[in-house]
């Protein structure tokens, strides 16, 4: 990916380049644009043509003690911003990240299956699937261990008010929404040093939940799985559970996913994946299982990538009837700069 280093930034602020130089830092701008075509069977749709754009600002620098810092702000599809983070990496105790929307905690392993393009459920066909997110659903502080632990990585995230939105202004706090949730934490372990090509991962999340006439304990989530790469092929399997712990209604979700990808060469990749999710009610007669499967192909030509996905969804949005079953094809041309 080519970077537009400091060009766009100086256009935003003429004095920013001199400020960056004085602090031994830099600001880079990267972006992408995608043209899409989506066709759904057995579903009434509007115009199948679509477009997506993104722009990411990344700044970094170094302190006198050898610690480094970075900031990342992502803008997607005309949004004010989609995600942002401020990180401080120390030489000995790891990286501390102040994060909003960047996939921290257990959210980083909600779907780790190998793919040529997107998650099985993320190809614009629409599934309504519920995956684990933990405190990554709002502003949180994340710590990642140093890289010299024999292939073991530890990620810990904490939020003083989970799933309560974010304070995006200077010295501001988020608003309060109608939720009974309090503080929460996530812990994730990843290990890639046991054998060549093998990566195993596991995570746990717990969020304080006010015990009321509707709930009966804290909201918890777990996830575990592994991927194994051999030659150009990568295989993966994982399970996860999101426990809402309510007395009536949807009590928890049980998910399992598996997939395989194959890199034919440096430019062409193929994949097949399945993600199943069972919605469990306190009244088991209302239980429903959603299943999404997707065959994907991606082909890169320098800064351009063509992506194709054929996705089938059974019982979308956990509808036990066949009314929400759908099949769709998505074709994307992505241009990166």
Where are these regions (language model features)?
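Outer-membrane beta-barrel proteins
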Residues: 1-337
């Amino acid at each position: 990916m080519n970077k537009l280093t400091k060009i766009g930034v100086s256009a935003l602020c003429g004095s920013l380049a001199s400020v960056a130089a004085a602090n031994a830092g830099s600001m880079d701008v990267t972006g992408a644009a995608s043209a899409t075509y989506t066709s759904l069977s057995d579903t009434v749709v509007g115009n199948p043509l679509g477009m997506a754009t993104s722009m990411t600002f990344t700044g970094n620098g170094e302190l006198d003690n050898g610690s480094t810092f970075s900031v990342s702000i992502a803008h997607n599809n005309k949004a004010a911003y989609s995600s942002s983070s401020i990180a401080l990496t120390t030489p000995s105790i790891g990286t501390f990240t102040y994060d909003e929307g960047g996939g921290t905690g257990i959210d980083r392993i909600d779907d780790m299956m190998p793919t040529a393009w997107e998650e099985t459920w993320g190809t614009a066909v629409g599934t309504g699937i519920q995956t684990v997110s933990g405190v990554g659903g709002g502003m949180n502080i994340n710590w990642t261990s140093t890289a010299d632990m024999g292939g073991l990585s530890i990620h810990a995230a904490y939020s003083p008010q989970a799933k309560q939105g974010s304070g995006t202004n200077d010295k501001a706090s988020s608003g309060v929404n109608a939720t009974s949730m309090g503080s929460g934490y996530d812990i994730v372990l990843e290990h890639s040093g046991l054998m060549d090509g093998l990566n195993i991962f596991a995570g746990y999340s717990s969020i304080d939940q006010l015990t009321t006439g509707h709930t009966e304990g804290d909201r918890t989530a777990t996830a575990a799985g592994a991927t194994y790469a051999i030659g150009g092929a990568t295989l993966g399997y994982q399970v996860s559970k999101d426990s809402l712990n309510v007395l009536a209604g949807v009590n928890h979700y049980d998910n399992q996913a598996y997939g395989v990808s194959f890199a034919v060469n440096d430019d062409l990749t193929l994949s097949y994946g399945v993600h199943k999710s069972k919605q469990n009610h306190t009244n088991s007669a209302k239980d429903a299982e959603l299943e999404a499967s997707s065959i994907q192909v991606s082909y890169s030509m320098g800064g351009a990538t063509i992506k194709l996905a054929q996705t089938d969804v059974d019982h979308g949005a956990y509808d036990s009837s066949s009314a929400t079953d759908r099949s769709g094809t998505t074709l994307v041309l992505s241009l990166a700069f």
